[in-house]
């Protein structure tokens, strides 16, 4: 077996499959583009779904890739086991309707065992297969595998809902008896027992059926085009090749671990307790790549995942004695390890470090708050004479403040207490069940459409005309190819078309189909790309249409031009965002409609009013400069040399279209654009908002819509000016300031009157002093308009020696408000209000000297007042 670095293993994989006619598909962003079913790219095949379900036919049906992926459904096991990771690389080879079982198995065996390639000892390899899949069993024997190394497994069948499915065959590497202390042997494989001896290194999925949840598996129909989908974990392959005990002792992780040793002064013990080193090494990889791809820490979705990873890694740093931000210092090491195939981490190093360090500092503050919360729990339990921290409280410390249960146990131990581990585990299980139920999962790939896949006629899009004559080369009605259609809805393909098919964020053209006499025979209501790349026109048929006849295709030119203005404005906006916010503000999605444009981009905070103004100003300046818009078709490498911006998630062919706007913007784009920015006329941002952690959205309008937006604002201002009796609109701010000053004065006078009224009322209330067990107290219902007045009562009470304790209750609206104030240490206002609040179906809390509660049961107010004496 060859000794190879991780970079060499990855490259050897790609090189081997290239010799078998595969195209190398670049690794794409971890943040899915145009796929709402996925939280993260979680496998090598996730980016190829469009090929497997037949939505798009690839240029080359043979594909290979090395794809970064994230899975976070098992975070708690990372660091505890030898092979669990949150971020990993999947090596894959794929056949989209081309080769199948025989070639996939033969080539897999060649790559693994050939001296030219990985050169694994054949006797170390074992394969599992689906019991009914005799063809795979026989093929493994034909390539030279000993039958005793072939293990039937009932679970070796891959399917997720409706869509492509089929048996799979897995390849395992036997690391020997040293990793099988109980000498269980092949039962470990046959019974799927978790073990460190037989390491799964590759799974080959033979996608040959269209799964249908409504019927038994035996009744699944064969796919019109069978596929191969494989996945080999790079980390596992490298561990086997480098003879590492775990994935962490490879060149993918050890440089990070060595840096952690330097920062902590601790030494990584391969056979000892090294969990913290593993957690940090794994999590900083995920953080570096995900942030580099535009995801940012937050409170939901991807952001919550990243925040949880960072906090977990940070806590493990503290276990190693690192008590200051340190994770950001590991980013360069991650970048250097992966630089040969993933240069983006080093390219975005400064930005990634900034985000990680900022989040570490924020967590330090949160941790401080959590410690206060924990101390409050301990103090509360001591007062009640209890010694067990409830599972729900342990879980809150874990979930809200990032406290590992072990840290809470340490706090409890110092206080002579214990924690309710079972209650904590139950709360954790509930959260995991909720997460599984609501998780965004990669659903089925969808059923293949055989009719559309079989249409291979040529169809060309003409950018340069709004009307042309073309032959009708395909008609689809009721999901079948037909020779003619006379009514209803149909899908048409022409040899040439002037209609733009929806893609790249630009909506489709609408228009009409006319016959030779000029009669309208169909209206075009949508245009989409067919699997083989043709423009598929959805039409409402008004008169008979026949195959191979010439028709005139006429788009709605006014509609197209409005869309073009918005699309070109989108490019200007993208460039302005880079200039004003920074290069990290890259496109995360766009929509160029008729009446507006929508642009999503990565940014870690709300865009300020000043920044929005500058962005809008810069876009308009470029419009008024009347910059020429040019398009050129070239190869992808030349385009990149020109400096054209390529977008994550977009699939580019060998030939690409480059759109330049003066010397201001240059992007790869297949859409339609105006010839000169002056055609846009005017640009106005109408809304900026967050749509997820680290992603912002701008809605904007151009041309007539922009003018109307300004007119609407002007009309509103004029109406306000009239209401304020301001002679001119520009005087509105001054008038508003005057009103605000009047309001402040009235509020001040009102507060003074309330204070006087409260003082007068307090004179009577404060006379009603009772005493029990040596404590003087006042408990009374008062009539006030808001809870703030209760505090005014309390402030007056504090100034004189009326009593030791004050309890005030007020019915405000349909609610009940309670205030408890104390002047002595042995009467804790916060604890007392917690005991009283349930009487009025409420709850509350606060400090030892003052606390408040709210409830809803007004008939129980007197009962609450009567209960005070019993609490003293």
Swiss-Prot record:
User: What processes in GO biological process is this protein linked to?
Assistant: alanyl-tRNA aminoacylation
Kindly list the GO CC terms recorded for this protein: cytosol
- According to its UniProt record, this protein's enzyme class is ligase
Q: Which UniProt keyword terms apply here?
A: Aminoacyl-tRNA synthetase, ATP-binding, Cytoplasm, Ligase, Metal-binding, Nucleotide-binding, Protein biosynthesis, RNA-binding, tRNA-binding, Zinc
Which PROSITE patterns does UniProt cross-reference here? AA_TRNA_LIGASE_II_ALA
The record's free-text note on cofactor binding: Binds 1 zinc ion per subunit.
EC number assigned by the record: 6.1.1.7
Q: Which SUPFAM superfamilies match?
A: Class II aaRS and biotin synthetases (SSF55681), Putative anticodon-binding domain of alanyl-tRNA synthetase (AlaRS) (SSF101353), ThrRS/AlaRS common domain (SSF55186), Translation proteins (SSF50447)
Q: Where in the cell is it found?
A: Cytoplasm
Recorded catalytic reaction(s): these are: tRNA(Ala) + L-alanine + ATP = L-alanyl-tRNA(Ala) + AMP + diphosphate
Instruction: Please name every pair of cysteines joined by a disulfide bond in this record.
Output: none
Looking up CDD domains in the UniProt record yields: AlaRS_core (cd00673)
> Cross-referenced SMART domains, in alphabetical order?
tRNA_SAD (SM00863)
Q: Which domain of life is it from?
A: Bacteria
Describe the function of this protein. Catalyzes the attachment of alanine to tRNA(Ala) in a two-step reaction: alanine is first activated by ATP to form Ala-AMP and then transferred to the acceptor end of tRNA(Ala). Also edits incorrectly charged Ser-tRNA(Ala) and Gly-tRNA(Ala) via its editing domain.
Q: What is this protein called?
A: Alanine--tRNA ligase
